[in-house]
């Protein structure tokens, strides 16, 4: 059995103008919603930064929020936690990390309701350092997703790694960067993607693959990609006779998984799951120490200790001045709150 866990990241900056937001909604968010509603077997994990949720509600796009809320309500999607304003978490004070996480929970719970119950965490830009873990764990998240470049051990196909901070553990999933980027840059069609997954399985009875990318890839960055790629993949993976019941509880998949192991059969089917469902399907591996990184970090960047080159490049004087300015702003805001 091959389990495909797909994550889509929905975000627009607070400075985005309403006309551009409307275009993104019409080109991407609504067409994606229609695809998910058409293919009831589709399962995926989604991240909505709270600042985008606010803007959707403020700019008259409540139908999008309602649509994704309904999908979550019937177990087709799950939401993740994150920082509300898309902060680069390793580069901001720890108290601000906690505030951003809390603000995101408050905003998304307000608009998505009880359907917003994140078990996992998406750090913006997949920027990671060990010291962001504790506030994430304390927020109630069971897992975090990181870029594949952060994986310091053998690539996990049939085990799930974990990491820890101050004696508290959290599960770690790694994005398949190569596969995700090939999808994002139209280097694979639906048939090639499915063939790639089957090739990955090899002689293993059960494996999982995690892909993650910007939701705007579908329809906004690449016009019609939600139909020419995603819908075609879903079409191929539909269960023809007896579609799975709501698999949010993962029990059906777990039973099928166990049956395959018992009968010593090699599975050839691909099942779509949320990332959280993988927790019930695969054993835990060793405790690891992921590398500080982002989904834009290269191996050469890591060797140079330049872990976040798009935001804090060691040779970029503009970056240095921006962070100096931000530090001043944070201190001013803190003092203002103390005086209020």
Language model features with spans:
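Active-site and substrate-binding clefts of carbohydrate-active enzymes
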Residues: 2-30, 37-39, 160-170, 174-177, ...
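CE4/NodB-like, metal-dependent polysaccharide N-deacetylase domain
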Residues: 97-125, 196-212
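Surface-exposed loop and adjacent secondary-structure segments within mature catalytic domains
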Residues: 129-182
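Generic structural signal for well-ordered alpha-helices
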Residues: 29-36, 65-69, 98-108, 133, ...
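Short, well-structured secondary-structure segments
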Residues: 2-93, 99-100, 117-123, 142-148, ...
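Secondary-structure transition/capping motifs at alpha-helix termini
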Residues: 39-42, 74-75, 109-116, 139-144, ...
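A short acidic (Asp/Glu
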Residues: 16-19, 55-60, 91-93, 128-137, ...
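Flexible loop residues that form catalytic
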Residues: 126, 149, 216
């Amino acid at each position: 059995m091959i389990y495909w866990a797909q994550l889509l990241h929905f975000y627009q900056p607070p400075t985005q103008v309403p006309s551009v937001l409307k275009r993104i909604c019409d080109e991407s968010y609504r067409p994606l919603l229609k695809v998910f509603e058409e293919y009831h077997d589709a399962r995926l994990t989604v991240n909505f930064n709270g600042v985008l949720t606010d803007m959707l509600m403020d700019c008259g796009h409540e139908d999008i929020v309602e649509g994704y809320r309904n999908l979550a309500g019937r177990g087709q999607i799950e939401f993740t936690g994150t920082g509300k304003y898309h902060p680069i978490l390793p580069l901001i004070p720890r108290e601000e990390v906690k505030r951003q996480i809390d603000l995101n929970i408050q905003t998304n719970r307000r608009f998505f309701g009880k359907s917003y119950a994140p078990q996992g965490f998406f750090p913006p830009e997949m920027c990671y350092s060990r010291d962001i873990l504790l506030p994430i764990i304390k927020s109630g998240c069971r897992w975090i997703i990181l870029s594949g470049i952060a994986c310091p051990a053998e690539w996990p196909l049939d085990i799930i790694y974990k990491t820890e901070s101050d004696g508290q553990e959290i599960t770690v999933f790694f994005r398949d960067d190569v596969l995700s980027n090939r999808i994002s840059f139209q280097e694979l069609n639906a048939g090639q993607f499915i063939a790639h997954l089957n090739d990955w399985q090899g002689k293993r009875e059960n494996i999982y693959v995690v892909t993650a990318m910007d939701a705007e890839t579908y329809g906004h960055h690449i016009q019609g990609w939600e139909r020419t790629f995603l819908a075609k993949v879903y079409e191929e993976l539909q269960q023809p006779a007896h579609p799975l019941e709501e698999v949010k509880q993962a029990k059906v998949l777990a039973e099928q998984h166990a049956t395959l192991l018992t009968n010593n059969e090699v599975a050839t089917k691909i099942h779509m799951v949320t990332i959280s469902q993988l927790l019930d399907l695969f054993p835990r591996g060793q405790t690891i120490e992921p590398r500080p990184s982002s989904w834009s970090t290269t191996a050469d960047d890591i060797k140079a200790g330049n872990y976040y080159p798009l935001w804090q490049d060691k040779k970029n004087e503009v970056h240095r001045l921006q962070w100096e300015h931000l530090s001043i702003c944070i201190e001013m805001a803190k003092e203002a709150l103390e005086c209020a």
